[in-house]
């Protein structure tokens, strides 16, 4: 690992450009040609993510510092939520993964920041394999079906957004996504109990996967099945939380107050990215910014309910992808790692064209944020503070615009009853 963060981030930027070029150049030109098999695809996913994770001595500064506070408290036997004062806005699951990686770093000499990134890299590799397996299961068992599955899996293996979140930022979104995508896959395989357990673990890791629960419940055939699935999916996080509170004789407020109300930061996504900084220049706009922040939960709830109703005749995967798009489209608060949510489910739903365009726009936002705020703040050296702030805030508008257009297209397809998955020409002809 480099000790010079400036040199490391500069070389990491070159690596990002190379991987993004591979992502852009990847095309399903000939689905009858030779495409790599799944072991090679998984190897590509690992080799794309490991170099920057190994040579970068930094991640997103606030997050890595928070992980260190959490693991120090956990390994010293202290109650984490009381000890770190709001720095872990999650339920008690990922902290134990972090604790295990911190102990690994201490015993092997592996740099702490590298150890914190490894679970997300492994989860990303596993997600790549899941995408391949799920797509090939839904396609013909000949070479064309394999080629289409390989293409979609490679779009994740080479995806700049997943690369930035796991290997640069150091966030663990991929772990949550693997559990949630696994829950969907088990649901597709008619294994509702295993599906509910996987979804429960995803909710325990980060609370936002609870959005998947109504999608499944609406598609179960009886009230008994609905209650059983819900009880298992919610029972797992409830039991773990209760066990943690009892074990430490802890006050639930520090844990639940953050985990159940965390909504990201306003002013970096959608209309709030323009309105919040503009209110600093023109104070007359501040009341409008305050109203937008005050209504954020109502807007989120309304968008989610509308998406659930609109997609009730679609498959669980199509409905969930549209639901995620609706939530991301209207949210006021935002975390840059949330940009990864859409990509694995878009590829599982075979929305390759939209996933490609969105990934490039989202990677632009992530790069500007990571190189402007969270790693070595290069932008602060090149631009004045107001210009850097405006650039960082407005960098999300291209990705947000893609989300809006994508959502509109999916809502129209749902209304018309058209299939959401793309049909490659070679497969459509057969």
Where in the sequence are the language-model features?
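Multi-pass membrane glycosyltransferase architecture that uses lipid-linked
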Residues: 1-257, 264-266, 293-430
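Membrane-lumen/periplasm interface segments of multi-pass, membrane-embedded glycan/lipid transferases
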Residues: 258-298
């Amino acid at each position: 690992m480099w000790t010079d963060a400036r040199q490391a981030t500069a070389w990491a930027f070159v690596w990002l450009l190379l991987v993004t070029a591979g992502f852009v150049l990847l095309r399903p030109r000939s689905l009858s040609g030779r495409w790599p098999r799944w072991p090679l695809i998984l190897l590509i996913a690992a080799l794309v993510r490991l170099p920057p994770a190994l040579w970068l001595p930094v991640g997103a500064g606030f997050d890595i510092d928070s992980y260190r506070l959490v693991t120090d408290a956990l390994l010293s036997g202290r109650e984490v939520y009381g000890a770190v004062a709001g720095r872990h806005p999650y339920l008690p699951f990922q902290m134990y993964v972090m604790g295990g990686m911190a102990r690994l770093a201490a015993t092997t000499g592996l740099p702490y920041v590298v150890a914190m990134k490894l679970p997300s890299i492994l989860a990303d590799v596993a997600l790549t394999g899941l995408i391949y397996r799920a797509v090939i299961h839904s396609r013909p068992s000949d070479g064309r079906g394999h080629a289409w599955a390989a293409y979609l899996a490679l779009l994740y293996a080479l995806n700049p957004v997943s690369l930035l979140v796991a290997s640069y930022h150091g966030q663990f979104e991929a772990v949550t996504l693997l559990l949630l995508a696994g829950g969907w896959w088990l649901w597709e395989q008619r294994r509702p109990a295993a599906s509910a357990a996987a979804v429960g673990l995803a909710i325990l890791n980060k609370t936002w996967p609870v959005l998947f629960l109504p999608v499944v419940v609406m598609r179960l055939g009886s009230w008994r099945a609905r209650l059983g699935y819900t009880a298992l999916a919610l029972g797992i996080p409830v039991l773990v939380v209760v066990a943690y509170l009892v074990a430490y004789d802890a006050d639930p407020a520090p844990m639940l107050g953050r985990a159940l109300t965390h909504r990201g930061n306003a002013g970096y996504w959608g209309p709030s990215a323009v309105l919040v900084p503009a209110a600093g220049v023109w104070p007359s706009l501040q009341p409008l910014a305050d109203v937008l922040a005050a209504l954020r939960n109502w807007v989120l709830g309304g968008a989610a309910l509308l998406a659930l109703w609109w997609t009730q005749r679609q498959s669980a995967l199509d409905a969930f992808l549209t639901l995620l798009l609706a939530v991301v489209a209207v949210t006021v608060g935002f975390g840059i790692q949330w940009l990864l949510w859409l990509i694995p489910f878009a590829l599982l739903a075979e929305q390759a064209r939209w996933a490609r365009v969105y990934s490039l726009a989202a990677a632009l936002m992530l790069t500007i944020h990571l190189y402007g705020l969270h790693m070595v703040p290069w932008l602060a050296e090149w631009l004045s503070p107001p210009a850097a702030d405006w650039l960082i805030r407005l960098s999300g508008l291209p990705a947000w615009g893609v989300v809006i257009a994508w959502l509109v297209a999916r809502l129209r397809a749902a209304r018309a009853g058209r299939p959401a998955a793309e049909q490659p020409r070679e497969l459509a002809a057969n």
